Design a protein with these regions (language model features):
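Gly/Gly-Pro-rich "capping" loops immediately C-terminal to redox-active cysteine motifs
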Residues: 34, 49-76
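Bacterial N-terminal signal peptides
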Residues: 11-22
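An amphipathic alpha-helix signature
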Residues: 72-80, 97-100, 104
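Electrostatic cytochrome c docking/interface patches
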Residues: 21-36
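C-terminal capping alpha-helices of c-type cytochrome domains
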Residues: 90-110
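Bacterial N-terminal signal peptides that target proteins for export
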Residues: 2-13
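Extracytoplasmic
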Residues: 39, 56, 70-73, 83, ...
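The canonical Cys-X-X-Cys-His
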Residues: 38-48, 99
Length: 110
């Protein structure tokens, strides 16, 4: 006799598996991340090479991308639950991945 798991259990297992995948496993869009950065982040962070001024007490995107231990996944997860000094941007997982991918571009020669 073959036992078939109910569809609801299969769906739950699939959802749990998907939740454990890295946020950036899907194809992120750095150009979308740049738009989000200019909208949400530029008040405090230097988010582009053409930006001349921001809050002096926060790291630039270049400094974040070049910091030891930087990873797209760590930044994406952080953006979903930011620290108290950051606004709650209510980003989707895809938006967080896009923004993390954009930040990562500062770790390479631009």
């Amino acid at each position: 006799m073959i036992c078939k798991a109910p569809r609801s259990i299969t769906s739950i297992v699939a959802a749990l598996f998907a939740a454990t995948l890295p946020l950036t496993a899907t194809r992120a869009d750095p150009s979308s991340g740049e738009r989000l950065a200019r909208q949400w982040c530029a008040t405090c962070h230097v988010v582009a090479s053409d930006q001349k001024q921001a809050d002096a007490d926060v790291p630039t995107f270049a400094a974040i991308a070049k910091s030891p231990g930087f990873s797209r996944d760590k930044i994406a997860y952080f953006l979903l639950d930011p620290h108290p000094k950051m606004p709650n941007m209510s980003l989707t997982r895809a938006e967080a991945a896009d923004l993390a991918d954009y930040i990562a571009t500062f770790g390479t020669t631009r």
